[in-house]
Amino acid sequence: MHKHINKESQMPPTAHRPLPTRYVELHARSAFSFLSGAATPEELIAACAELNMPAMALLDNDGVYGAARFHLAARKVGIKAHIGAELTVRSQTSDIRRQKTEGRKQKAENQVAQTFVLPLLIRNRTGYQNLCRLITLMKMRVPKHAKPGECAVTLDELAAYADGLICLTGAEDGPLALDINHRGPREETKVTERLIEIFGRENVYAELQRHFNRAEEARNHAVIEIARQLKLSLLATNGIGYATRAQRQVADVFTCIRNHVRLETAGRLLSINSERFVKSPKEMAGLFADLPEAIANTVELSSRLEFTLKDLGYEFPKYPVPPDETMTSFLRQRTYEGAHLRYGRNGEFTRAQKQIEHELKLIEKLKLEGYFLIVWDIVEFCKRQGILVQGRGSAANSAVCYSLGITAVDPVGMELLFERFLSEERGEWPDIDLDLPSGDQRERAIQYVYQRYGPRGAAMTANVITYRGRSAAREVGKVLGFDDETLGRLSGLVHTWEWKDPKDTTERQFKDAGLDL
């Protein structure tokens, strides 16, 4: 039985050993861990920059939704943005028994499923591809409004897509913690040993966090012992849930909203303290003064994580062309077929041909033939089906788009500037917008794309829905236990937020709404 551990006893004396001065936070959640993380990616990077930390890893729940914003914010201040995710994993076994019911034999299968959260870090481009495959697998086989735990990958799927990924054993909801808490000592390393088998011993790190929690520290002792038995490297993280200590209050509100409870009744659903903020290397070294290797390993592991989003690049999809054609030749043929129809064979065609050749050479150089052919294919389908379709925006500046029938404005005759649409110097991809009717006709076009290119070869852009001021005020008011009348006044106040004279203040506005501050 573990002894009582207080705040002081968790931090061994440090006078006899030097403290590491370098540390990289490799386990942080953002607000893209919906209603779990309380800080935006930009706020996490700002806290990291203020502490002169050279890198940070973002691991959101079951997705990489915040990765782009995290990467862009990090690039602006010279911080390396490591990417990963916390994946929900289901380890499942079957217990088959037979029982007799009304004289007939009935086979009943009891499935015992253990679900845990597995932090994964991306080591290289292959790892990014594999993590995305795992996320896609889990998302596509569950209902749209799946309950927590329904969306999960299996250990066998992890084994199929483990290349390029680094595995951490996680915190209180990780595989090793669940083994320690719920299984006997003979089985307590079963899942961890399977993870070693899947990822390789050098790619599995025993994660340790210290938030002045007795149960957590007792678990840490067991993790350290198991790590030494299995020859795993120790890794210190702070399990970041918010950028600053003050944001803990936001995290508590999110916890209440997620669990549909008021703050006064949330109880043990809330974190016991506000320690999950971005801490300095000095603070983290002090927390792990007895385990300097756990701090040093953060720097070592960070150096192994070669991948950032700037290495991803983009490969445009390939259009299926006849066996005797290339995408370049097929696009050229379709373009000139349309150009002869649009411009005829007079002097106007000669003038247009010069512009078309200029555009085709740039399209070929940038390897964009597939993109133009796919858009052309969608437009052709719509025309065959009698669906109104029209390209718009800067695509109207392209003679190739005009010749392919994507747009309706002659850019040569109108002397429009092609480089406004596509320019090698600008380094931006072209954007061809297609206007379609709403309703069934639009849906028919979408379904054609899925059928033509396959369910894994096409996707719709997802929108992240965020709280506006009025809805946010109502949700926070519910958490604080306000009655309906007060909620109405509060949301109305935020909805029309303005200061009409210099004497107006936030405090006065709330008092005018009848709120006792």
Regions found by a protein language model. Give the residues of each.
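Alpha-helical scaffold/interaction cores of sigma-54-like transcription cofactors
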Residues: 2-93, 100, 110-517
